[in-house]
């Protein structure tokens, strides 16, 4: 049984009333790979947009392993210092990481964000030299559509992320660069230009699953869903 730890920002923690892509991926993997697959992490809640705090357990379907390491407004900058303890405490086999939008939007430029990616990987391997990782580039979002300098930073960061994966991948602790969800459309797959709706959740889940299927033979292809 493989243990997966989702690591991310608001798109990963999700909001009250949502399924989240975490749930969609768990469903996908247990149906196409191993019914005993599980998600692990030090956190469990959703973000409550009414209170502005990660205090909700109001999942659209709560009957799944809800654990994660994700936070509204958190990025590589925030997760790099946390990942070591999270790995030691929760013992994941695979990290599924979707970060970068918050860093680029509020804290660091593309080069600085890429350095935090490398710090994250170093800290993860210090906790478990054999941990596997799947990293998702920053996907389309409303700010990149309307803010050309920000879009340039996103594009540069995604190039630097790919370079970090190429530089740091190693046999005992492989790192995969997932492809952005094909045909991801912020006007169809999000509810506000950034955060995924049901179809977006399925697309993000399949991006992670597809990378692992192609590289590691985990699972098999399935028909994309939108609900």
Could you tell me what each predicted segment is?
Residues 81, 105-120, 144-157, 190-199:
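Active-site cleft segment of glycoside hydrolase catalytic domains centered on the general acid/base Glu
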Residues 140-179, 198-202:
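Substrate-gating cap/lid alpha-helix
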Residues 5-7, 189-227:
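Histidine-centered active-site loop/cap adjacent to the catalytic His
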Residues 80-91, 167-196, 201:
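N-terminal hydrophobic signal/anchor transmembrane helix of membrane proteins
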Residues 98-105, 121-156, 179-184:
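Active-site segments of SGNH/GDSL-like serine hydrolases
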């Amino acid at each position: 049984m493989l243990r997966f730890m989702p690591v991310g920002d608001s798109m990963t923690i999700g909001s009250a009333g949502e399924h989240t892509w975490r749930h969609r991926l768990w469903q996908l993997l247990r149906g196409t790979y191993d019914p005993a697959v599980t998600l692990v992490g030090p956190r469990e809640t959703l973000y409550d947009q009414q209170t502005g705090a990660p205090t909700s357990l109001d999942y659209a379907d709560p009957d799944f392993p809800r654990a994660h390491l994700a936070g509204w407004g958190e990025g590589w900058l925030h997760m790099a210092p946390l990942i070591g303890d999270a790995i030691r405490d929760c013992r994941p086999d695979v990290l599924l990481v979707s970060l970068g939008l918050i860093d680029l939007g509020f804290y660091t430029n593309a080069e600085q964000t890429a350095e935090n990616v490398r710090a994250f990987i170093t800290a993860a391997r210090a906790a478990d030299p054999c941990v596997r990782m799947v990293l998702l580039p920053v996907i389309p979002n409303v700010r990149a559509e309307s803010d050309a300098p920000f879009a340039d930073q996103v594009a540069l960061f995604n190039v630097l992320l790919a370079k970090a994966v190429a530089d740091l991948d190693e046999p005992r602790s492989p790192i995969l660069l997932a492809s952005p969800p094909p045909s991801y459309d912020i006007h169809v797959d999000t509810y506000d230009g950034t955060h995924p709706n049901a179809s977006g959740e399925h697309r993000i889940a399949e991006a992670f699953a597809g990378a692992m299927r192609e590289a590691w033979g985990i699972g098999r292809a399935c028909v994309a869903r939108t609900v």
